[in-house]
């Protein structure tokens, strides 16, 4: 996910939702 790199602050939150794993 490219937008993950842009949102460094929300990375922790995305990991919980499953986006961080991707």
From Swiss-Prot:
The keyword Transit peptide does not apply. It holds the Pfam family Leader_Thr. InterPro entries: Thr_lead_pept. It comes from the Bacteria. The keyword Amino-acid biosynthesis applies. One of its GO terms (biological process) is transcriptional attenuation by ribosome. Keywords: Amino-acid biosynthesis, Leader peptide, Threonine biosynthesis. This protein is involved in control of the biosynthesis of threonine. Belongs to the thr operon leader peptide family. This is thr operon leader peptide. It comes from Yersinia enterocolitica serotype O:8 / biotype 1B (strain NCTC 13174 / 8081).
């Amino acid at each position: 996910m490219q937008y993950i790199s842009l949102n460094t602050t929300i990375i922790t939150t995305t990991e919980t939702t499953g986006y961080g794993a991707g």
